[in-house]
From Swiss-Prot:
Superkingdom, natural source: Eukaryota
Protein name: Phospholipid phosphatase-related protein type 2
CDD domains, per the entry: PAP2_wunen
UniProt key word tRNA-binding: no
Residues annotated with Phosphoserine modification: S299, S312
Spans annotated as Disordered: 291-343
Subcellular locations according to the entry: Membrane
The keyword Transmembrane helix appears for this protein: yes
Gene: Plppr2
């Protein structure tokens, strides 16, 4: 920005790239997430279990909607929370800009596309950050669902919904001589319970709810830390970030306390979501900072007098005028002396 006027940049590829590239990629990610979540296009791996295994014999906690952290609440939080935070942050940044001395050079340009479309820096930042967040949210869903489909790890209440016939499977009941399980069941028809409940009970690792919460919290906390400017206090931003981390931690605790997931499932979900958010913030949106403007090429019809000039190295480092060096390397004074003539 020079003289109070924003830097303008003309681009005819921003709208086609957004419509035909980024929107298409986002649609593919959404479609794949839907296929993994709500269809049987990718069947869940059938993993065996030990007879009377206490790790999978917890009571059935009921449907997911009856949980203290139901999926509807989690989806609403991971969608509305980061969106409102980023929206408020960008509005505050646009209407109350920081002084140049306390913030890096923005370098954002107002992009003009065609004769009518003009994209200001606040609008571009808002679309960029929310678009990348949406892409990462569905990517996290894909990673979590793919892990559940491939591994097929049972939940802690798996045997309660499976209801296997141990007598028909040849599983003797535990006794003092055999305190632990001694037979591993791999028969796919061993479960007599509801097929839908059994299929849902085979999708424990990693915990999808924990992954989504960790992704949303990490992305939002990094935005608060890197974008928000608070003067006179060092505890405001850490307090906000810890307040954001608390619900995600509580979701993991609820999943374990209700026997819906193991601790290992929750931890794997936390790591998956946090890793995806960290990658997107660091490598895609560049820590929510704008790249400095690096200049542009002059068009052929522009005046060459506007081109940047370069100083000559001879002007920067002039040769000393006091002494010169002989061609054989012996120095001698630069002032010429007239030889004496014998008379």
């Amino acid at each position: 920005m020079a003289g109070g006027r924003p830097h303008l940049k003309r681009s005819f590829s921003i709208i086609p790239c957004f419509v035909f590239v980024e929107s298409v990629l986002l649609g593919i990610v959404v479609l794949l997430a839907y296929r993994l979540e709500f269809t049987d296009t990718f069947p869940v791996h059938t993993q065996g279990f030990f007879c009377y295994d206490s790790a999978y014999a917890k009571p059935y906690p009921g449907p997911e909607a009856a949980s203290r952290a139901p999926p509807a609440l989690i989806y609403a939080l991971v969608t509305a929370g980061p969106t409102l935070t980023i929206l408020l942050g960008e509005l505050a940044r646009a209407f109350f800009p920081a002084p140049p001395s306390s913030s890096p050079v923005s370098g954002e340009s107002t992009i003009v596309s065609g004769a009518c479309c003009r994209f200001s820096p606040p609008l571009r930042r808002l679309v960029r950050f929310l678009g990348v967040y949406s892409f990462g949210l569905f990517t996290t869903t894909i990673f979590a669902n793919a892990g559940q489909v491939v591994t097929g790890n049972p939940t802690p209440h798996f045997l309660s919904v499976c209801r296997p016939n141990y007598t028909a499977l040849g599983c003797p009941p535990p006794s003092p001589d055999r305190p632990g399980p001694d037979r591993f069941v791999t028969d796919q028809s061993a479960c007599a319970g509801s097929p839908s409940l059994v299929a849902a009970a085979r999708r424990a690792f990693p915990c999808k709810d924990a992954a989504l919460c960790a992704y949303a919290v990490t992305y939002t906390a990094m935005y608060v830390t890197l974008v928000f400017r608070v003067k006179g206090s060092r505890l405001v931003k850490p307090s906000l970030c810890l307040a954001l981390l608390c619900p995600a931690f509580l979701v993991g605790v609820v999943r374990v306390a209700e026997y819906r997931n193991h601790w290992s499932d929750v931890l794997a979900g936390f790591l998956t979501g946090a890793a995806i958010a960290t990658f997107l913030v660091t490598c895609v949106v560049h820590n929510f900072q704008s790249r400095p403007h690096s200049g542009r090429r002059l068009s052929p019809w522009e005046d060459l007098s506007q081109a940047p000039t370069m100083d000559s190295p001879l002007e920067k480092n002039p040769r000393p005028a006091g002494r010169i060096r002989h061609r054989h390397g012996s120095p001698h004074p630069s002032r010429r002396t007239v030889p004496a003539v014998a008379t």
